[in-house]
Amino acid sequence: DGSAMTIPYLNVDCIDYCTFGNSKPFRVKIRNTLNDNFIYFYVKKADASRIYGLELEHMLSPNNLNFLVYQNTLVEEHIAGIPGDEFIQDFLPKCSKTERNQIAKSFVKFNERCMIRLLGDMRAYNYVIVPIHDFDKVIYKIRAIDFDQQSYEGDLKVYRPQFFKENIPMV
């Protein structure tokens, strides 16, 4: 709500230097001391394509994103989910035929959203699968987690996750 009343109850639990990706972010764990809930944020150097990608994701996808830009620093909220490469290797083989059909439909939607936003390089390690448990089934949503490859290429295949060999099992 914008109020600063909760700030005294927030602690920085840990700060990790992450060696993955091209941004090499710091991962900061913030914990609420009243209820022990925590959240992760990534602090990285801001650049125009990353901010552009985050803005488009926030406006054009069904997922809201929390991020803050101050001068040349970008703070992004962690996007929870199962990394795509882990999901393909460990979870996809165990899915039922109905679940696989639903995952394929979700991947088609994800593929089109990436194309519309010119979000490239959506290899399996650049998106997460979010399982949503319903009464009698699990629904799988796909969310991008890397937003820095915006509008660089003239080849449209770059913006279609279906064309990356890592994603063939999802297709």
Label the model's feature ranges:
Residues M59-L60, F91, Y159-P161:
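General N-terminal targeting signals
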Residues Y159-V171:
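Charged, amphipathic alpha-helical linkers/stalks
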Residues D1-E86:
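Conserved ATP-binding subdomain of kinase catalytic cores across diverse folds
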Residues P83-E86, Y152-L156, F164:
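Active-site catalytic-loop/activation-segment of kinase and kinase-like phosphoryl-transfer enzymes
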Residues D85-K94:
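AlphaC helix of the protein kinase catalytic domain
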Residues P93-Y159:
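Conserved kinase catalytic-core segment
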